[in-house]
Amino acid sequence: MANQPQVSALLLSLLVLSLVQSLHAGGIAIYWGQNGNEGTLTQTCATGKYAYVIIAFLNKFGNGQTPEINLAGHCNPSSNGCTIVSNGIRNCQNQGIKVMLSLGGGIGSYSLASPSDAQNVATYLWNNFLGGKSASRPLGDAVLDGIDFDIEQGSTQYWDNLARYLSEYSKQGKKVYLTAAPQCPFPDRYQGGALNTGLFDYVWIQFYNNPPCQYSSGNSANLVNSWNRWTSTITATKFFLGLPASSQAAGSGFIPADVLTSQILPAIKSSPKYGGVMLWSKYFDDQSGYSSAIKNSV
């Protein structure tokens, strides 16, 4: 009986440690859609690895163009072949997984010419992918959770207008989540203005293909310094560490799983805005098993 206070104190310490760890627990976001060999959306969410799935990409829109979605080898949107994705979207959402549509990407034809052009794109997105109505919804009748900005080319203006117009649709019922994947050099050349609106829920920063602010040869200082600048300057609900899921997924910036879990994550998880890790992409994650190796540490 004399040892009971010590045991109680130990249990209390363990409970406090568990609470602290749970407060900083994050989720994994994954990009899906650019390789037909990465499995369906339903299969992706059935793995239990991911909290967010970003469908990539709507890579033609704006400046008067007819918008087009490109899901690589998954389906052919020109023949309405991608409406079957609705089943996958709903299956994911039924598991509590948020599903977004990503705008842009590294290859495509997209830009915004004016505030009115941004409004037209927002209206199109609302009617064709969100809570609006259209006879030509490319992914069928499922209602996505939000829109992801992965703007890497084209115009540098009016993305803030697009964010504001999309945010306004949250007033019509279901919240429209806004997410973004800026490059780690601060500020982002294309999305800086949009991110300054403070309207974004999740920001998954690309810490790869950018040597000045990525992990390199055992040096994590540039990455951590960049992370701290982003999280202390931009207003967003949560920030995510964006990484390639394998060394083949990007030209540079891959972090071995053991280095990520032992060195990088402990250095950034103290941030109150820490949300988890974003990976490019589902196909490369399948090949490497990266998410399985890091999941318990994220």
What do the PLM-derived regions correspond to, one by one?
Residues A2-V7, Q21-Q263, I268-P272, F284-S297:
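Chitinase-like catalytic core of GlcNAc-active glycosidases
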Residues Y274-S281:
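Long amphipathic alpha-helical assembly cores
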